[in-house]
UniProtKB/Swiss-Prot annotation:
Family classification: In the N-terminal section; belongs to the Fmt family. UDP-L-Ara4N formyltransferase subfamily.
UniProt entry tagged with the keyword Magnesium: no
One GO location term (cellular component): membrane
Identification of the protein by name: Bifunctional polymyxin resistance protein ArnA
Location of the active site: 104, 434, 619
Stretches of the chain forming a coiled coil according to its record: none
Pathway: Nucleotide-sugar biosynthesis; UDP-4-deoxy-4-formamido-beta-L-arabinose biosynthesis; UDP-4-deoxy-4-formamido-beta-L-arabinose from UDP-alpha-D-glucuronate: step 1/3; Nucleotide-sugar biosynthesis; UDP-4-deoxy-4-formamido-beta-L-arabinose biosynthesis; UDP-4-deoxy-4-formamido-beta-L-arabinose from UDP-alpha-D-glucuronate: step 3/3; Bacterial outer membrane biogenesis; lipopolysaccharide biosynthesis
Site (Raises pKa of active site His): 140
Length: 660
């Protein structure tokens, strides 16, 4: 039986080995690239796959149609997911005739969702387990195939329980996988009335509330002990982390948060005292409790506290859906540079925003807007400004997958717009320069230019008309129901983190990334229809500054406006862009690590994009609205943008890959 496996972490390693031991053929393994902001104490699935000689991949979005097609070509009989962190689309789940099965770290239907290992300890459970279940669209809701119970000892902490669960998982898989291989797959429906769901835990969730019962505080310490981030408190403004503790029943009448003694170090809770066995001050080293008290300058009777409150008015909360994308991650950086903004974000990956994950004003949830509607509705209600940036926005996908473009770019975003109407929230919506279509004006005016597209049998226009229809719906909601909105239309923004060379390898990237990939790999640069199409290329820094000013919205000048954001002075054909890029490439200090230039190759758009494609000769913005509403003027020359973008991608190529 041929299997495709999605796996990560120690559980992923156990699962891969168990599938092999049961005699399955593994066609491919899909995993994640390690996040540099995460403490990777666990085993590497990618390394294990490499050692076993099994093809392994770590795509940013495994649900992308390109990857769905690749998995379909593998023709799996069965699919397994062992602690893979992203939900799999229904298209993938339906690829295997025998079904798709997930290993979950709890006794389902209890503790569905994220971090069940930590949550069972937080809640003081005495038992947990592992469950193998059939995968359906809803997370962790499919029929149960098998489960194994695990007792939780009073001295168990997150790491010891993790090891127990890994051992239980291996025993479970060793028992059930041979049976499944023979076609005998048990199926027991979950009782929805018994289901509980828990969300992702964040480092800040480790903050101790000394007014809680001592058992609650002690369980929190157990649940997030090393290598997790730890439970923490403050002495004045100094943060300290508690790595291990024990319960003392007598608080001697002290107020919660009061230091009862320093040797041993004991702190009063609501109904007892917590003895701190080991801890750490700030970024220091772990020490025993009495030494920690000395380091912190604690004395009996001192009061521990919550972090100092920030003064001034409440920060502006900005919700960014698609926060890991090109615009989303650059906008996040700009907002976090200002003290009065707090960013809430969702995306299906976090590689581009890993540098923000520990920022106290950045709150990220990994998820899919087509699945996590409850989370989105709650955060639309909670936040002040909403930016729905999720979209399929690469031309080749318009002809490859027009229905997917419509479903995501229009239908899913319309639901978000309706939430904004319902909760009366301001929306800053990304329209696109594509809505102008084949407009013949010398420069495109937001309020006067006609929006002209081709015939229905050219699916290339599905993106343009999906965005245009949303523009019109948003405008109507503004006119009829008072929705506060601004539509912005980016014109060919470029810069670091635009997309990835891997995306270019599967044909799903912007033009400049594809050109850079050709230079990196020594393949000919393809000029579609000779590369005579002209565009106005805009530096991401210029674009983000304009977008930031839209969010600031001085004097409400942006309300109800459509604003082009582009650089009319940076007009160039694709051929001119390629020539400029080649010149910068030849001058780059890393040039010697890459193959010789393979030349230009002229190709027809039909052969590259498919029969449903039409191109546009020019696309130049009028930026009068941006000047008037934002006081904004683009300033960065195209050569500077090209050089910075090229440098980013060249330095992202592995040294060994350059040499090969």
């Amino acid at each position: 039986m041929k299997a495709v496996i999605f796996a990560y972490h120690d559980m992923g390693c156990q699962g891969v080995q168990a599938v092999l031991d049961a005699g399955y053929e593994i066609a491919a393994i899909f995993t994640h690239a390690d996040n540099p902001a995460e403490n990777t104490f666990f085993g590497s699935v990618s390394r294990l796959a490499a050692e076993l000689g099994i093809p392994v991949y770590a795509p940013d979005n495994v649900n992308h149609p390109i990857w769905v097609d690749r998995i379909a070509e593998l023709a799996p009989d069965i699919i397994f997911s062992f602690y893979y962190r992203n939900l799999l689309s229904e298209e993938i789940l339906h690829l295997a005739p025998a079904g798709a099965f997930n290993l979950h770290g709890s006794l389902l239907p209890a503790y569905r969702g994220r971090a069940p290992l930590n949550w069972v300890l937080v809640n003081g459970e005495s038992e947990t387990g592992v469950t193998l279940h059939r995968m359906v669209k809803r997370a962790d809701a499919g029929e149960i195939v098998a489960s194994q119970r695990v007792a939780i000892a009073q001295d168990d902490v997150a790491l010891t329980l993790h090891h127990k669960l890994c051992q239980a998982a291996r025993q479970l898989l060793n028992s059930i996988l041979p049976t499944m291989k023979c076609g005998d797959i048990p199926s027991v429906p979950q009782r929805e009335s018994d289901a509980t769901y828990y969300g992702r835990r964040r480092p800040e969730d480790g903050l101790i509330d000394w007014h809680k019962p001592v058992s609650t505080v002690h369980n929190l310490v157990r649940a997030v002990a090393a290598p997790w981030p730890g439970a923490f408190s403050y002495n004045g403004s100094q943060k300290f982390t508690i790595w291990s503790s024990r319960i003392c029943p007598d608080a001697q009448g002290a107020l919660p948060g009061s230091v009862i003694s320093v040797s041993p170090l004991r702190v009063a809770c609501a109904d007892g005292a917590l003895e701190i066995i080991t801890g750490q001050a700030g970024d220091g080293i772990a020490v025993q409790g009495s030494q920690l008290a000395q380091t912190l300058g604690l004395v009996a009777g001192a009061r521990l506290n919550r972090p100092p409150a920030t003064s001034g008015k409440r920060r502006i909360r900005v919700l960014i859906l698609g926060v890991n994308g090109f615009i989303g991650n650059h906008l996040t950086e700009r907002l976090l540079n200002e003290e009065n903004y707090e960013v809430y974000g969702m995306d299906i990956g976090s590689n581009a925003i890993s540098r923000f994950l520990l920022h106290p004003r950045f709150h990220f949830v990994e998820g899919d807007i087509s699945i996590h509607s409850e989370w989105i509705e709650y955060h639309v209600k909670k936040c002040d400004v909403v930016l729905p940036l999720v979209a399929i926005a690469t031309p080749i996908e318009y002809t490859r997958n027009p229905l997917r473009v419509f479903e995501l770019d229009f239908e899913e975003n319309l639901r978000i717009i309706r939430y904004c109407v319902k909760y009366r929230k301001r929306v800053v919506f990304p329209s696109t320069s594509e809505v102008y279509g084949m407009c013949t004006d010398a420069s495109f005016d937001e309020d006067k230019s006609n929006l002209i597209v081709g015939p229905v049998n050219k699916p290339r226009w599905i993106y343009s008309v999906s965005k245009q229809l949303l523009d019109r719906v948003i405008w109507a909601y503004g006119e009829k129901e008072g929705l506060r909105f601004t539509l912005f239309r980016p014109f060919n923004w470029m810069g670091p983190r635009l997309d990835s060379l891997n995306a270019a390898r599967i044909g799903s990237s912007r033009a400049i990334t594809q050109l850079i990939l050709n230079l990196v790999e020594g393949t000919p640069i393809k000029l579609i229809d000779g590369g005579q199409q002209k565009r106005c290329f805009t530096d991401i820094r210029d674009g983000i500054e304009a977008l930031f000013r839209i969010i600031v919205n001085d004097g409400d000048r942006c309300d109800g406006k459509i604003i082009n954001i582009g650089n009319p002075d940076n007009e160039a054909s694709i051929q001119e862009l390629a020539t400029l890029l080649l010149d910068s490439f030849d001058k780059h200090p890393l040039r010697c690590h890459f193959p010789p230039f393979a030349g230009f190759q002229v190709v027809e758009s039909r052969s590259y994009y498919g029969k449903g494609y039409q191109d546009v000769a020019h696309r130049k913005p009028s930026i009068d609205n941006a000047r008037r509403c934002l006081g904004w003027e683009p300033s960065i020359a195209m050569r500077d943008t090209v050089e910075e973008t090229l440098d980013f991608f060249l330095r992202s190529v592995d040294v060994a890959e350059r040499a090969s």
